[in-house]
Amino acid sequence: MYITIHLKKGIPAIFGMALVVVCLSGKALGAITISIDYSLDSTGFFSDGDGAAKKAALEAARDVFEGIISDSIAAITPGGANTWNATGYHPGTGASGTLATDLSVAADTLIIYAGGRALSGSNLAQGGPGGWSGSGTVGFVDNLYNRGESGITNGSAVELGTQTDFAPWGGTITFDNDDVAWHYDHTTSVDAGKFDFYTAALHELVHAIGFGTSNSWDDLVSSGTFTGSQSNTSNGGSNVSLYSADGGTTYGHWVSGTTSVRLSDGASQETAMDPDVTAGTRKYLTNLDAMGLADIGWQLNITAVPEPSTWALMSGIALLGFGAVRRYRLNPLTCKSSQ
């Protein structure tokens, strides 16, 4: 499944009531660990001269989710007859297939393989959750499906009924490495005409953990709107209109121009998960973005959201930005593979 995101100038309007959250570092109690794995970065995107800044920006985006997700998910522990393959899109080649065999995944941990490659057309980045194939005891295979989450029902190698949770082993994220004017330093203002790497990383990570890419998301989509109760409340009591890049077959983003309030300071901002981003600007996670994650099953503890250290410097930048319109396509592989 492909999801296209358009990057263009947006003018966010004041929306809803501000939710002010104290900006502290550290993880939420019982937090999920998101382990960024660069071992499949076959093009060396994260090991060139800008590699340290790229990693710092990606890991700062990762820290946001480690700071608010308080879920608990079971470990994946292969051994003996219990064997499995983690599948997905290789971040360095784009090939779809096995990424790792008999990968051990610790409890409360997601693994995100990150890399870079030349993406076709005007694509900036791609990301999404991984799939799997496996065999073994009933308990082992069930755990590949649900990692102990009761809201994911399955049987005979197919998922059954309405899904209210999501718990993948992890996923992949890839950034264009040949013709994008990236701004890598997440601690400084975004240069005019450049695309903010932190913003792209934040957006892709949300997709990697199920936003627009999971069965529990799909089960809440109706007539071009998202019907999740917490998103509805965050959106002033209305279902959230969605954007489709393929004429209504799939919906993976809030509709263009959707606004909410930043978790970091309660200021109004265009959501991180609408399809529009402007060169020269930075986006932060908003309340509506977070409620989308809550509705697909993630337990959240929104008391502390770490953002780049200079978010205050950037607070007036989100409405600015100059440069050509740019589109990028996400390439998530949903966790629906059978044994």
Model-found features: residue ranges?
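Bacterial N-terminal signal peptides that target proteins for export
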Residues: 2-15, 309
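N-terminal cationic leader/targeting segments used for protein routing and processing
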Residues: 7-10, 28, 332, 337
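Bacterial N-terminal signal peptides
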Residues: 14-23, 27
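Active-site micro-motifs of SAM-dependent methyltransferase domains
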Residues: 21, 207, 320-321
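Extracellular zinc-dependent metalloprotease catalytic-domain scaffold
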Residues: 29-202, 207-304
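A short, hydrophobic C-terminal helix/tail in secreted or cell-surface proteins
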Residues: 307-325
